[in-house]
C-alpha cells in the first residue's frame, strides 16, 4: 500500500504536466481549437521599458508606491485590478474610466452603474502627481493604471507576475452609456461572456483565466443575492449552487428577519479573499462559484476543462499573466493616434 501511494504521488504531477501540454500551444498559451493564438493588434505599438530614456525609474516609482499601499491595505489589490479590467473593456485600455464627469457634458464611465463600487482612484492620482513632477507630460495615466494593477497583484509574490508593455496614451472620451453596454455582468451566461470577450479579441482560455481574478476581493450580497433567495422569482435558490455554500452565503447575507442585506459583503473566493492562487477554481469545481458568471464557466465543456486544469496554481498563474498582457492591449492608443494625449491630471482631459 505504501509503495502504491508513493507511485500515485509521483505519477500525479506527470499526468498534470501532460494535460497542460495537451492544452498548450507552443508552450506559450492555451487555445480552444488547436490553432496558434495570433499575436495582439498592439504588437509593434507597445514595448517593454518604454520610459527607460524619457522617464528613467518610472516603473520603479509605480511599484514602490503600490506595494507600500497594498502592504498597508491588502484589499487594494483586487480594487486596482478591477479598475484596470473595467477600463479595458470599454474603449480599450485608455484610462477613460479615470475621467470625472464635467458639467454640461455626457456622464463619464465612472458614474455608470457597474462602476459605482470601484475605488482606488486616489492611488493613481498620487502616482501621476509624482511622475508629473519628475517627468512632465511623459507617463500616461493608461500606463500607470496598467502597471499599478500588475504590481498590486504581484505584491504577495515580491516579483512581477507578468510583463507590462508600455507606450499607451490616454483617451479623451468617456461615456457611461458605453460602460453599461460593454462591461460583462456578474449575472451573464456563458454565451454572453464569450461574445463580449471575443469582441475584445479574447478567447475562451482568456475568459476562464481572467475570471480567476475573483480569487481575491469581496462582493456585496446585493450583486448575487437573487441566486440565494429569489432565483426564479419564487423565493428559491439557484440549484447549481453547492447547498452548503448556499447556506453559508444566506447566513452572511441575510438580516435578522432573514431578508437579503444587499450591503453585506463576502469574499469572492470561499478559500480566502487575500491570496492570489487557484482557490477560485478549486471552489468553482465544487459548485462554489459566487456569481452566475462564475457558474456559467461550468456550462461549457471547454471552459470547464480549462477550469479544472487551473486548479493547479502554476498553470493558472502562468496563463493569467498571458491573458492580462492580451487584455491590457485592447484597442490601445499610442503616440500619433487620433484622439489620444498624455493627460496632466488623470481625472481631466487637457
Swiss-Prot record:
Binding residues annotated for substrate, in chain numbering: 184
Cofactor info, note text: Binds 1 heme b (iron(II)-protoporphyrin IX) group per subunit.
Top-rank taxon, per record: Eukaryota
Active site, per annotation: 86
GO biological process: hydrogen peroxide catabolic process; response to oxidative stress
Cystine pairings recorded for this chain: 55-135, 88-93, 141-346, 221-253
Gene Ontology cellular component list: extracellular region
Keyword Transport (UniProt): no
Protein name per the record: Peroxidase 24
Organism per entry: Arabidopsis thaliana
Lineage per the UniProt record: Eukaryota, Viridiplantae, Streptophyta, Embryophyta, Tracheophyta
Gene name of this polypeptide: PER24
